[in-house]
Each structure stands twice: as C-alpha cells, then as structure tokens.
Curated annotation (Swiss-Prot):
FAD binds at T61, W62, R63, F64, D73, S74, Y79. Its EC number is 1.14.13.-. It comes from the Eukaryota. This is FAD-binding monooxygenase acrE. It comes from Aspergillus aculeatus (strain ATCC 16872 / CBS 172.66 / WB 5094).
Length: 593
C-alpha cells in the first residue's frame, strides 16, 4: 500500500532536464492540466521552462486515479483546454469521460503541443526555498537533485496529498489494500470475494458502482451520507462535436463569466418566491438535467437561506429514498432530517450508486455510530469489538485537500519557516496565487482561488493567464522579485472569512472547510465569490502589483503594499448577503489581533 508521493521517486534519466544543478527560468511542479497549461504558455514567452512530475506520465490526477469506475464529474467540452490545437482534431465518446479516455486526451495534447520533452518524470520535490542573494528558487528532489529557477510554480492541484487514517494494525492486513488515488494499474479482482470500501465521497461512490455487481459480498463503510446527484451520462458522436467546434471559443469565453466556471448559473429567483408546485417543477427539471446543474443552477438563496435549503434537501431525499428498498438504508443514505445543509459538503455524481444497496450482496455499515478503530490480519475492527472479515479493501478516504498539496512540497519562506508552520493556524495567500514570504512563488488551482467551487480548467486558465502576464510584466519592468505583504494577504483572508461566516459552510466538516484531517485548521480553503468576481479582483493587481513588495534588478525596493481589488466585492456581497463585508472584516480583525 502506497502512502506518499515520494515513494514514486524514480527519475527517467540523469542528463538534460534530469541533470543535477539544472538552471531554468521557470520550474513547475505537476504535469496535470495546470502544469501543462503553464508550460505551454510560458514557452511561448521564450522562457526556459521545465516541469517536475512525480508520476510516470502526463495527466496528474488521471495517472494516479485509475480505480474501478474512475470518471470525471465535469462535462466536456468544458473540461478541456481552450487551446485550438488541442480540440481541433479531438472528440470525446461521452460527456463524462473515464480515466482511460482522459489519459488518451493527455497523450493527444502531448502529440500536438510537444509537452513531454520538457517534463522530468519520477521527480518528487521535497524542499524549495527562495535565495534572496541570487533571486532564485533552490528546489531539491527526493533523489538528491537540485534545480535553480527565477520563478517557481506549484501546479500540484488539490489532491496530491493523500489521507489515510492511522488505524491500528492496518499494515498487518493480509489482503490487497489500496487508496483510490494510489491504485495499481493491474486489476484488483473482487469476483467471488469479500470486499470493503471505506468512504463514500466521490471515489467511494464510483468504486461502489463498479464493485457492487462483481463482489461476492461488498461492505460499504459510511460515516456521513453523500447527497449524490444523478450524472446523466450520455454517449457523444464525433459529428455533433465537430458541428459545435466553431462556437467553442464562445463557450470557453462564457465559462469564465459564470459563477462556477461552467455554462450554467444560479437562478435569480428565490425559492421562497415560488409556489410549492413551481418549486417542485423547477427542481424536477434540474434533477432530470443531471450533473451539478441540480445544485449550481438552482435558486440563488439555496446556500444562504435555511428554508430554501431545506426545500431542496427534501426534494432530493424524496427522490433518493424512492430508489432504496430497505428502511434502515434509506435512513442512513438519505435521512428524513438532513444531517447537514445541502451543499455544505460536495455532492458526488452517480449513475446507479443507490441501486447497489438493493442487492443482497451489498451491505451498508454504519461507521458513525460504531467507528472503525483498526484492522486485523483478516478484517476491519469496529469500536464495539466487531470485526468485519474481508479479503480486499478500498480506502476511499480522500486527501489533505488544497493546502496539503503545497505543504507537501516542503517549501520554506525567506524567514526560514516552513509553509506547514506558517499555515498551522490558518492559511493565508494573496489573490489565491501568491504567499507572503515566498517571493516569485505562484500557485494555481489551490488555496484561496475558486478551486473547489469551480470547474477546474476554467480556474486554471484564468489563473494561468494572470501568472503569465505577471511574469511578462516583471521581465518588462526589470523586476527581480515580487513578494506579497502580510497585510495584503491578511486582507484577502478576511474577505474569504466574511463570505465563509455568512454562509452554511462552517456548520459542517467538509472538503470546503479543509476536510477532516486531525489538527488541520477548520476554515474555508477556496474563494467563494465566483469566477467573474475573482477574475476582476486578480486583474486589479496588474500591472503595478499593489499589495506586493517589488525588488528591481538594481536592488531598489518599491513597496506598493496597499492591497488591490478587495473593495470590488462590496456590491456583490451586499446583493448576495444583504450586508457589507466591511463589518464582517472588522469583527474578524478584532478576533485575529
């Protein structure tokens, strides 16, 4: 059973991009969507750019997540690059591709953009620090190599730090046991066997759908119900996609103008304005459409008004309970009384998840009232002493989401502190792109960006263009480094907290609030005000870099420390929440100092 990325350290060479003491303009960590996009765009600027990738091929999460049933929950063509060369001769077989088709897509991207020539595979970054005397990042890998770069880009996403609870005796389990994100390439055979799935997040739902029809007996261990929504997957033809390609540029432009970076947006109506019959009809239409339209294209007050939220939950629970046969299972998977607000945790998309529990061979284990405490050689031990004997275990236990991915790189500040130390009480970034004390470090699809509230590729391209433009300005203005001030970072954080505290998110432990990692700060880790507002705010920081300490090539320091763009949220906040963010900021500032 793999636990850490460093176990995959196995560089594919010792010369060229694999050489020790590598000198580059830009070093990127991660060769998924983020890293590939940044590499392509920065090479166009004439910058010597190299990517360090822990895995053995392109694709990021889709190289590691090859568990049974693994499939993206964003629809194409939105879940792909807007780069014309990449979509001109590419078509998909379905609106929700599986990991195999996504791997084929990345192979196609490499073919047309020649990506792999600048990607060093099997290269696991374990230490990085900015040398102020050279104005260069010094980056070290697990196998002992060092690289030097003016710009360092963390493109490791939100799920590169896996989470496996420290259950007693887990190392003694005799059968196959794998985390979904460290799944082996070979098939894990469960036919005729006793199998267990621990966790019912996105990957747990998908493995349940795959193993339910195959396993001799399947036990699914549940702590909290997942408000899963029908995916409504359908087959796509090449002809229908090719007919749409002339308007792809407009679609890619539109996705940056919606709240979640998809092609739909919230209804401007309140759930309380419609009659019961009108609400039911509206919910039914959203439900039949499938996908995240059910939550992200719903009434505007669903996540703000408890009554509106309960209306949506009741509709979902009624639909879901009707698909289940057993009353106990109904009460665990879709309780009459909601255990948390709808949308408080990220819903998953499913095809026949609930129907699996109508099989005689599939059993739902309540791991909340009777938690897992450890493993024996042959099974899973519960708090009351019960042992569930199984042959195969799938750990769908998730990630140290968002913040864990950057901390996992071992980055250290110019003050000598580690990012883990700096973020031990609360994460702070500026613009969801930079961190105070870490000059010339950029991160994307990570902490304090729209990340978990958005379509991934939309966020990546919006942030990626900003990073490219920031670097272009630095080169044009002969700037050696930029470092966001603590004041600017704190102002950005207070803005996010103001949104957090006016919403339902702090009412439950969730991925949005940092996950369930022991000792991790309980805080909103993504920017919640939507894609258009985010894009406008970060653009306000160019080309003059408000909120940054700027060091020129001659050593002159220019302190433009007043944060830019934060007041852009005022009108939006008042329209959405009925109160200005300033009062929330003042209250929070009193708490923080």
């Amino acid at each position: 059973m793999h636990r850490e990325l460093k176990e995959f350290s196995h560089p594919h060479g010792s010369t060229g991009i694999y050489e020790d003491n590598l000198q580059v303009d830009v070093l990127i960590v991660g060769a998924g969507f983020s890293g590939i996009y940044m590499l392509h765009e920065l090479r166009k600027q004439g910058l010597k750019t190299v990517v360090y990738e822990a895995g053995s091929d392109l694709g990021g999460t889709w190289r590691f997540n090859c568990y049974p049933g693994a499939r993206v929950d964003s629809q194409v063509p939105l879940y792909q690059f807007s780069i014309p060369e990449t979509y001109k001769d590419w078509t998909w077989s379905t609106n929700y591709p599986d990991y195999k088709e996504l791997r084929a897509y990345f192979d196609h991207v490499d073919k047309v953009l020649d990506i792999k020539k600048d990607v060093a595979f099997g290269s696991v970054v374990v230490d990085a620090q900015f040398d102020t005397s050279q104005s260069r990042w010094v980056v070290k890998t697990q196998d002992g190599r060092t690289a030097y770069a003016k710009y360092f880009i963390a493109a490791a996403g939100v799920s590169s730090k896996r989470y496996i609870p420290e259950w007693e005796g887990i190392e003694n389990f005799k059968g196959p046991i794998h985390h979904t994100s460290f799944w082996p390439e070979h098939e894990v055979d469960v036919r005729g066997k006793r199998a267990a799935i621990i966790g019912t997040g996105a990957s747990g739902v998908q493995v349940t759908q795959a193993w339910g029809p195959q396993a001799g007996h399947l036990k699914v261990f549940l702590r909290s119900p997942n408000y899963s929504i029908p995916m409504r997957r359908k087959e796509l033809t090449a002809d229908e996609q090719n007919q749409l390609k002339p308007i792809y540029p407009q679609l890619f432009d539109l996705r940056e103008k919606t709240f979640t970076g998809a092609l739909v947006d919230f209804s401007e109506r309140s759930a309380l304005e419609d009659s019961e019959a009108e609400r039911e009809a509206f919910y039914e239409q959203r439900y039949q459409t499938g996908g995240f339209d059910f939550s992200t294209a719903n009434y505007k007050d669903t996540m703000l008004n408890p009554v509106a939220n309960r209306y949506l939950y009741d509709f979902w629970a009624k639909k879901t309970r009707a698909r289940l046969n057993d009353e106990r299972v109904k009460d665990l998977l879709a309780p009459v009384e909601p255990p948390y607000f709808f949308g408080g945790k990220r819903s998953s998309l499913e095809t026949d998840f609930y129907e699996q529990f109508n099989r005689d061979t599939v059993e739902l284990v309540d791991a909340k009232s009777n938690p897992i405490v450890g493993f024996t050689e042959n099974g899973i031990k519960m708090q009351d002493g019960t042992v569930h004997e199984v042959d195969v275990v799938c750990l769908a236990t998730g990630f140290d989401t968002t913040t864990g991915s950057m901390i996992n790189l071992g980055v250290r500040s110019i003050h000598g502190t580690t990012l883990q130390e700096d973020w031990s009480q609360a994460a702070e970034t500026y613009l969801g792109l930079t961190v105070s004390g870490y000059p010339n470090l950029f991160h994307l699809y990570g902490t304090h960006a729209p990340t978990l509230f958005s379509q991934a590729v939309t966020t990546i391209e919006v942030q990626g263009r900003w990073i490219v433009d920031a670097i272009k300005q630095m080169e044009r203005q002969a700037i050696r480094s930029i470092n966001p001030s603590r004041e600017a970072a704190h102002a950005w954080k207070l803005q996010i907290r103001a949104f957090q505290n006016a919403s339902f998110f702090p009412t439950v432990h969730s991925t949005y609030m940092g996950g369930s990692i022991p000792g991790k700060p309980f805080e909103l880790v993504s920017y919640p005000a939507g894609m258009p507002m985010y894009a406008r705010q970060i653009r306000d920081a160019l080309p003059t870099f408000p909120g940054f300490e700027v060091v020129k090539a001659d050593g002159e320091k220019v302190e433009n420390l007043a944060p830019g763009g934060l007041e852009a949220t005022t009108n939006f906040f008042e329209r959405l929440f009925g109160m200005p963010p300033s009062s929330a900021k003042e209250d929070l500032a009193k708490q923080d100092h």
